[in-house]
């Protein structure tokens, strides 16, 4: 009886902690599945994460102007710059700074010379991104894990390592999603 009570007490004490472990295991498995389904190698996937982190650090250190909002997205060494900067000169400086990184193969500089985006506009962009991703999940012609979706000021940018057919299907899905003003493909094609 004492053993049963001790076991029950231990279970009650450890139960909440074990739930966290399950989330870590499940989350780790889901993340592993995403990487396994990605066309990039694990090394390239990690390099892309490093590019995004290093670029963000460089931008925050080198460009301290108020009103700047720069996002860096990397996919297979192709870098997409989105957001707002105060001048054309800074737009070019940001590109030059990021182009100096050894892991960067190509840059799509889509920075806008404009004031910083409002929170309402950012929320709208997040909703558009979610809608496009949801629609891609339900599209047979596109493996949604192969396409990265970024939205800035109602413009949807699509990146990925895809066939021409997958690219066109993804573009069609994004273009017909509510709230999308324009679609800009930045794909690397697997079927040259």
Regions found by a protein language model. Give the residues of each.
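N-terminal targeting leaders
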Residues: 2-7, 12-15, 20-192
